[in-house]
Amino acid sequence: MFLNTIGARDGSRPEKKRVGRGIGSTLGKTCGRGHKGQKARAGGFHKVGFEGGQMPLQRRLPKVGFRSAKKRFVAEVTLTQISKVGGGVIGLAELKEAGLVPTEAKRVKIIATGSVGGVVTVRGVGVTRGARAAIEAAGGKVES
């Protein structure tokens, strides 16, 4: 077997339509386009979303919401995720290294979901009231 002898398996690719080759082919004369009308002509297709002059769906419905540009730079981390980082001091750099927050994140907030694995010191990261209580109850501390 050589690379130049390899071909597609039989039936894996549909055969090319040969139009205009007689009545018996079912693609003769009008070539499967029917009689007259816009879709029978060359270049006779309308743009996507065109509804024949009726107000298109995209324009009938109101605009809703927006995507905040700030979302890229703010992240949330749970107490359970913090325990994966390990003990010691936890800051923005440590969370980025552990892959818990995106590298472009500028602000991080720890939320009280789950439980703290051990004693940790949180430095330079926002903390909710519940998360602060859980960290301090586990013997850790929160530094601003």
UniProtKB/Swiss-Prot annotation:
> How the protein assembles, per its UniProt entry?
Part of the 50S ribosomal subunit.
InterPro entries under this entry? Ribosomal_uL15, Ribosomal_uL15/eL18, Ribosomal_uL15/eL18_sf, Ribosomal_uL15_bac-type, Ribosomal_uL15_CS
User: What does this protein do, in the record's words?
Assistant: Binds to the 23S rRNA.
Keywords tagged on the record: Ribonucleoprotein, Ribosomal protein, RNA-binding, rRNA-binding
- Give the family, as the similarity comment puts it: Belongs to the universal ribosomal protein uL15 family.
Q: Name one GO biological process term.
A: translation
Its protein name is Large ribosomal subunit protein uL15
Q: Where are the transmembrane segments?
A: none
State a single Gene Ontology molecular function.
structural constituent of ribosome
A single Gene Ontology CC term: cytosolic large ribosomal subunit
The segment annotated Disordered runs over 1-25
